Amino acid sequence: MNTFPLIRTKWSNEHMMAAVFLAVVAYHIPIWRIASSEIAVFLLLVSAGMLVDVIANILRFKRLWCSVSAAVTAGILSALTFGVPLWGRLLGVLIALIFGKQVWGGTGKNPLNPGLVGLLPLLFMFHFNLPFFPNSWLLLPGAILSLPFLLIRPYTGIGYLVGTGAVMLQYGFNPKEILISGSVFFACLVVTDPVTITREPFIGMTGGFLAGFAGLYFLGSPLYAVSSILAFNLLSYGIERGRGKAEPEQLRLTKLKLPKIYTHSGLNSQLLDLTSEAVRLQCQKEFASEEVLNRIRAAEVFGMGGAGFDTYRKLLTVIDSKAEEKYFILNGVECDPGLLHDRWLLRNFSEAIWSGMKLIQACAEFKEVILTVKEPDTIMLPENLKLCQVASRYPAGAEKLLISEVLRKDLSREQIPAECGVLVLNVQTVYSVYEAVLGNRKADTRFLTVANLRIPEARVARVKLGMKVHEILQAAYPGSGTAFAGGGLMQAYTAEDETVVDRNVNFIVAAPFPKYKESPQCSGCGVCADNCPAGLAVNRIADLVEAGKKKEAAGYHPEACISCGSCSYSCLAGRNLSLRVKEAKTAVLEQHN
């Protein structure tokens, strides 16, 4: 089943490039003050650059794509070539966009910075007045606007500034020199280009330092400044091609935070019970561990966090584990912003959950029993149950990430938590154990979240396995529109008329179909890889899949993907990256089978 996030980041490559363009425009202020005719020249260069890019995109993709990146390239050349004849500057723009970008496949595919590719031949053809910029404090607005872009490749940008600063200290330059020499300009707008600069911290810092040092030490010739950055571009290209080939050892919790979705959470709303079966709390009885296990097996209790794994087998694995210390974690995190039924259960059926917990404790001896939540409520906890609040990041509720966060134990991809003596059960699974043992009930019902993103609002429903998704949605939100189901907002799929609730469904929602613009203009920003809990080179895998090179993509270990959807959510190019990674993962698994 192909799942995808129903929500996406509001940021895009176009937003980022428009902000860069604004900073580039600000660097022209002192130039325009000297020669107002340069305003017309700037507009001509930018228009020419965008025209070339539009034509190339139509020829390659058979459709229009935003050409703001071409405007940035033309703007950079305009700022650095003041005094060069107009025909030479136009030639530089053409060289930059054709030989610096389009011959490599377009935006995001180029190994060299297009602006510098266009500037390099001009350095041989014309005499440049150095430094690049006029001696004016009017450069300050451009410098201030460009500083935030250090965050894109911070190590390289800071390294460049340190390199130029080292030369300044040696020669006693005044602070104004850092502006007119172009140090801030290059550090923030050129060597932070995510397409052509590596994300490796040490190499980025070192390469940036050497490029910055050369750029000022040989101030008499800008050729050194440009060629040193281009050489670093080539080094970065080789490094980035090799990134992600090392097999991921363990999952990591990224810094990805997802927005709150609902204006009305539904935590205080009445349960929508579609089972026609009353939920009855029963008195606690004493059961031998063997009887508890037998009833769990007979009731076919399964993991209700979304995986649907057999709880009886999981318990046996923990019991048989050779681990000296065993832990029991009740997972109530709900890191997906679309879910709320686990928190609702803790509020309304906490006593039943504690009863289920004690039944499980009768089966094995645990050093600690821990309840993990994202937002703690005022719940009376039983004795010896430890409460642990985890970071509000996605996907903090994933089993191995939770173990790492709570127990400070990092498990490799091959290690199974239950075999290591760690039992992680969703709070609804624990409730289901309570019903199975004390109520002798089959695990054929479940609580789930039903939502309508058009309002946006959600509520908790109790349904029977096998019920049609559309019927449940109609009962909760009549006439609400297109239906989706799955593990949450980040792991949803389109619900057809005959789609039913199975063990893996804990979320049903009416929502507009997500708009993935599927832009081919990946900027190489690396946000998808940074937000991947498995540490995969997501953009590289996706590019290879699109090129029909799934065997080559296998070298980047797509089988380690946990299908969390973080990459699709955060992609600034609007690509459904998780779908590409899943294709590569499926190809690898089929090959191994």
Language-model region placement:
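Alpha-helical transmembrane segments in multi-pass membrane proteins
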Residues: A19-A26, V41-D53, N57, A70-T81, ...
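N-terminal signal-anchor module of multipass membrane proteins
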Residues: M1-N57, E249-P259
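Iron-sulfur-cluster electron-transfer modules
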Residues: L256-E383, C388-V406, G555-E559, S563-S568, ...
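Long hydrophobic alpha-helical segments that form multi-pass transmembrane helix bundles
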Residues: G105-L150, G157
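Loop-to-transmembrane alpha-helix initiation sites
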Residues: L90, P111-G115, S136-L138, K176-S183, ...
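Ferredoxin-type iron-sulfur electron-transfer modules in oxidoreductases and energy-metabolism complexes
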Residues: I508-S519, A529, P533-N593
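C-terminal ends of transmembrane helices
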Residues: N2-I7, L51-K62, A96-G108, A143-I152, ...
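Hydrophobic alpha-helical positions that pack around
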Residues: E365-V469, A475-S480, G488
